């Protein structure tokens, strides 16, 4: 089992100074506190990064980016043009050497036009983004990441922290090394993984789902689309599926020292197979493909879910 974490570079290079005279006062300034509002083109990018602290972004119906930011010790670098707004922590001294240890906590409160693309990064800090209704890339090395109302492509990643994503109208990648992952109300493909933590996927309408964890449980409560592909892998945890009645899928189940249980009779039909630690069987018309693999955990399949929006808050 391989869990791939894309760790983006968390130190953002300063953008080139702007030449627009009306925005000149907002460009390339180093400050300890920023309270400003700038215009952003429709579909523009908001790029925020810090070393330690908190980032909070909310979407609104104005064509402006409003920023309220401060830092306890150090300086903030702010750049803006009509298509991109950037805010980062200046972590180099006059000689160009990095000085992470001398930089204090920063706090960003930012409102963005709906439809903006967000790039949010923290070394040690929590990230929250809601209501932007655009693409989102959110990454924290040590901190929790929570995103809602993203569209098209959404990525939420952490190394040490929990990841939560909800109300995503598009594809989602949610990953962490040490922490739990929860995805809720997603309408695109889902890729969710954790090394040391549980993975929960609830109320999704997805044609392709891939989940992986090493030492945690996997819970999936959602639809199985005809012709869809679904994969669930855990080394030492339980895999639990809550799927609607009438689901049609071919199941491939593999477990070394765990057991398999379902709320329906498992019948090995023609073309299916069963051997020690592995079985294949069909439910309904068998159009979807479902793969479940665990080394020392249980596999539980429940078709008692009466809707695709059923929640599992156990």
Feature-to-residue mapping (PLM):
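Intrinsically disordered, low-complexity terminal regions
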Residues: 1-314
């Amino acid at each position: 089992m391989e869990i791939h974490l894309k760790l983006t570079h968390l130190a953002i290079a300063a953008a080139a100074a702007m030449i627009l005279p009306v925005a000149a006062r907002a460009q390339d300034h180093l400050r300890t506190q920023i309270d400003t509002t700038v215009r952003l083109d429709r579909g523009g990018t908001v790029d925020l990064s810090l070393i330690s602290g908190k980032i909070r972004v909310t979407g609104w119906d104005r064509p402006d980016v409003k920023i309220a930011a401060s830092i306890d010790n150090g300086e903030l670098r702010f750049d803006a043009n009509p298509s991109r707004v950037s805010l980062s922590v200046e972590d180099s001294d006059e000689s160009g050497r990095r000085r992470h240890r001398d930089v204090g906590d920063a706090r960003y409160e930012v409102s963005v036009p709906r439809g903006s693309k967000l790039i949010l990064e923290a070394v040690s800090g929590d990230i929250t983004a809601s209501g932007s209704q655009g693409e989102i890339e959110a990454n924290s090395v040590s901190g929790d990441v929570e995103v809602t109302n993203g569209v098209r492509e959404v990525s939420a990643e952490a190394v040490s922290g929990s990841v939560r994503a909800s109300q995503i109208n598009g594809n989602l990648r949610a990953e962490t090394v040490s922490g739990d992952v929860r995805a809720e109300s997603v309408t695109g493909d889902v890729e969710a993984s954790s090394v040391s933590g549980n993975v929960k996927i609830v109320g999704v309408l997805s044609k392709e789902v891939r989940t992986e964890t090493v030492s945690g449980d996997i819970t999936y409560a959602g639809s199985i689309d005809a012709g869809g592909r679904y994969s669930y892998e855990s080394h030492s945890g339980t895999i639990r599926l809550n799927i609607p009645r009438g689901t049609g899928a071919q199941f491939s189940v593999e477990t070394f020292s765990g057991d398999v249980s379902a709320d329906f009779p498992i019948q090995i039909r023609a073309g299916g197979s069963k051997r020690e630690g592995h079985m294949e069987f069909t439910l309904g018309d068998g159009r979807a493909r479902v793969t479940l693999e665990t080394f020392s955990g249980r596999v539980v399949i429940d078709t008692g879910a009466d809707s695709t929006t059923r929640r599992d808050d156990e």
